[in-house]
């Protein structure tokens, strides 16, 4: 048995009666990659054969879960960022070949090796801040070869580094140039070719859509969801980011894992996702980077007890920010979340948004031994401070993996 002793443990146990599920002066026992026991130090009786690490009063939390990223992509859009700051409109940038299509071109042109090398830098930035589980979407290929290439890279990242990687097929992200004016045909291609092939090759753990006036209609997204459902794949969606599209209510019909962004959710939609057990994933980094003003309906989400996850939305266009700790601070400062809500959002609720709540996201006997020993004592510091208190140890499947 491996033990971490003299620790303050924020278990994030959903059944805990006290804030953060915080346990003072406890020991955490690990065996075979799972949590074996959590006991008060007054009851701990270590064996001479045990491997013991003294936390010296440090805080232990579950490993962080980034449940919404687009971290596999080619190129960057720094020049476009500069143009926007100089007053050039997004429409004009797009006319000059910028916007999402510029990332599609760069991603299509990159070899799998090049894409892996570019993407692993972004992944490592997340791991160094305490992430032990990450979701990675496709969506910058928009043709079969390139979408599969992105998903292959995501799988390889999970094999190469100490992190759980969940992959999501997001072919319904934007309309590729070759389908201009034929969005229904593109949706047919997703349903009849891209989705079945990705599923057959075991490259997709879930299916995502972008339901918005600038992307795809609820009717088109329904077709994708129905095709995913037939294959037994869970669904999720970029919903209500720019307008009230009805996408979240649609997602609730399919018991979606999550609806993400959700700045324009109305109460009827909140009630629908509450009834379906769907997580609302909040993405304050995109809100900040795009200088939006409409924040998610926090009081409605609380009123109807919708679990709120928090994620980076790491992507080249609207949030090139690889920091979960920054997202926690932004969740508090921009969206009015409490530090306890943000920590639950990047652990327990993030796990639920990936359908992994039975394995990760809180600390209890039988759960995966994915946790962080922090150089701080109180969990509120993780949202309060940024760039100050980092991981002292990063434990993945019961083994120390500092990266």
Swiss-Prot record:
Binds 1 zinc or iron ion per subunit. SUPFAM superfamilies: Composite domain of metallo-dependent hydrolases (SSF51338), Metallo-dependent hydrolases (SSF51556). Transmembrane segments: none annotated. Keywords: Cytoplasm, Histidine metabolism, Hydrolase, Iron, Metal-binding, Zinc. N-formimidoyl-L-glutamate binds at residues 140, 315, 317. Fe(3+) binds at residues 68, 70, 238, 313. The keyword Metal-binding applies. One of its GO terms (cellular component) is cytoplasm. Catalyzes the hydrolytic cleavage of the carbon-nitrogen bond in imidazolone-5-propanoate to yield N-formimidoyl-L-glutamate. It is the third step in the universal histidine degradation pathway. PANTHER family: IMIDAZOLONEPROPIONASE, IMIDAZOLONEPROPIONASE-RELATED. This is Imidazolonepropionase. It comes from Hahella chejuensis (strain KCTC 2396). The gene is hutI.
